[in-house]
Amino acid sequence: MLQPSNRKYRKDFKGRNRGVASRGNRVSFGEFGLKATECARITARQLEAARRTIARHIKRGGKITIRIFPDKPITKKPLEVRQGKGKGSVEYWVALVQPGRMIFEIEGVDEALAREAFSRAAAKLPLKCLFVKRTVM
């Protein structure tokens, strides 16, 4: 699973996930992409499950690029522990995703296969996604 190797501080503030993606919103590395259409927190486990689904569907065909990274720690206190006594320990890692953000990209496969692979991967993610093609400018 993806997580940062080292950080200056172990725990983050809760924060808010608002706005639209101004960066990482175009297909850059592949021919087809899976684009987010709403805000969400995607966990490292969800990302890995979606990646495995894509890899299993396209077999040895193409190259998968993951465009997001789970770099935000989410903390949790143990069950049946009273409030107070400091912040809980890091439970898992998430990537904050805004609408328009590219999540995965594929190259080296035909469109029908890529569309089906992304459709299966989108079912593993907690947000609505859109299949997009690279536009040449």
Curated annotation (Swiss-Prot):
One of its GO terms (molecular function) is structural constituent of ribosome. Pfam families: Ribosomal_L16 (PF00252). NCBIfam families: rplP_bact (TIGR01164). Keywords: Ribonucleoprotein, Ribosomal protein, RNA-binding, rRNA-binding, tRNA-binding. GO terms for cellular component: cytosolic large ribosomal subunit. This is Large ribosomal subunit protein uL16. Residues 1-20 are annotated as: Disordered. Residues 7-17 have a biased composition (Basic residues). Binds 23S rRNA and is also seen to make contacts with the A and possibly P site tRNAs. Belongs to the universal ribosomal protein uL16 family. GO terms for biological process: translation. Part of the 50S ribosomal subunit. HAMAP family: Ribosomal_uL16.
